Structures are given as structure tokens and as C-alpha cells.
């Protein structure tokens, strides 16, 4: 499964091939932000749920990518033949996401999404990874799951899974770049300029994001 921030970095590197990148994965948001603060890393991509006053001094953030959320179903699901669904249509349907870990950014995001639209997002059950989840969704007429539009997933052809757009409004997952304001690494400045030029210039009522994500729309260093 490929992540949207990884895709952003690949596009950045194609545009700036002489810029050296050392990419690491840090699961925990607090650990990643602490690593930025101590200069262990220069920046991190996160969905920033905390207000600025609760971030370490000198830490800044800017929302750089809004990733639309899609519905993934099997061929026997009620919505399998649709091209798009609305959040209102999903009320009463079980959306299974056993990979959600409590106290993480994506847990906060999907809790907010469920509360905003009255959705039944179920994180119970053992999480055996992506492949077993896809296999279960493929064989179920009732279960569906959410995936990011830019999240690359490969499955066997016989699963016949369907990716449906969610509209009116479209939930978007807000990825932000987090960095330290006094970090003068030249590649960091180049990356920030690139992301600022590439990010969407307008967000309107056709999309939805949690209230905490709005804090980072115009924040920059």
C-alpha cells in the first residue's frame, strides 16, 4: 500500500532530482513531532490534531494535501454498482476499519467523520493486515471500508473490488507538513516552496474536514 505523502515526495524528487532525501517512517505523531523539535528529522507529514499552542515552541505546520476518502466494497455490496455515494447514503451501513489504532491521527479523523455524518465506523475485530481485510470486503455483501483516493492498493482480480467516490460533501484527509521554524536546511525550504505551489488553492463546501484541520490551512513559517 503506497501512502500519499510518499507520492508527494516522489513527485518532489522528480522535480528536484539533485536534492538528497532520507525518508523514514515514524508511526507515532508525538514521537515524530519531538524528532522534528530535536532536529533528528527535518520535517514530517502528519494530520495535526493539536492546536498550535500545544505544539513545542518553534514548531510550525501547513496543510499541504487534502486526500479524498473513497468507499471500497465487494461486488455483492448494495453500492457496488454505483459510481459515487454520499455520506447520507452510508448511514446505517457498517464501515469496517480494524486497522484504526486508538489515539492516532487517523483515529481522530474517522471519529470526527463518523460523528459529523452519523456513520457506523467499526474498528473492532483482529487486524491481520491489508490482504485479509480486502479478502473479507470482497466476499461480504454488507461490509465496506474507507480508503484514500491516492492510496495505492493492489488486489487479486477475482476480488472484483469497487472504489467509489464519496460526494456532497467529499471527506478529505488533511495531510500537513510539520517543521521547525529555525531549521535552515536548504532542502527543507525547497520542499516547502514546492508543496506551497502544488497544494489546492481553494477549499469549499463540497469538501469536509474536521474542525481541527482548519487551523492549518494558512499556517506557514
Tell what function each PLM region has.
Residues 12, 36, 71, 89-90, ...:
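Residue-level signal for nonpolar/aromatic packing positions in well-ordered secondary structure
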Residues 28-33, 37-41, 99-162:
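Hydrophobic hinge/microswitch elements
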Residues 29-37, 48-62, 79-80:
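Ligand-binding clamshell of periplasmic/extracellular solute-binding protein-like
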Residues 54-62, 67, 131-183:
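Beta-alpha-beta core module
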Residues 59-69, 73-95:
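Flexible hinge/capping segments at coil-to-helix
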